[in-house]
């Protein structure tokens, strides 16, 4: 029996001739007994889910030297995360990995305000005030 495939939480389509796609997996704030741990590590689950949905070739290879020559930017992926989880993810995911995967983060704070982080902003430590 095949496993049932679920879609992403948010799918956006746009760009020229609707040729750009943005897939976003979301993990909200937890209120469970172990909420502190869940809120800080929730990004791992979201990242795993989004990676399993990446069925598109992420890069092209040069015919002359076999090196990676370009990244497919038509498909972008995002993590919608509670700010504590986003803070950890931004520090732990290397910028180079985020760039190849076209991975973005949408961080939501307790007031419901959203901050957007592009792949070039990954691999850095951000203090609470940035969120």
What are these regions (language model features)?
Residues 10-14, 18-34, 53:
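Conserved catalytic cores of phosphodiester-cleaving nucleases, focusing on short active-site segments
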Residues 29-56:
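Mg2+/Mn2+-dependent nuclease catalytic core
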Residues 54-112:
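Nucleic-acid nuclease catalytic cores
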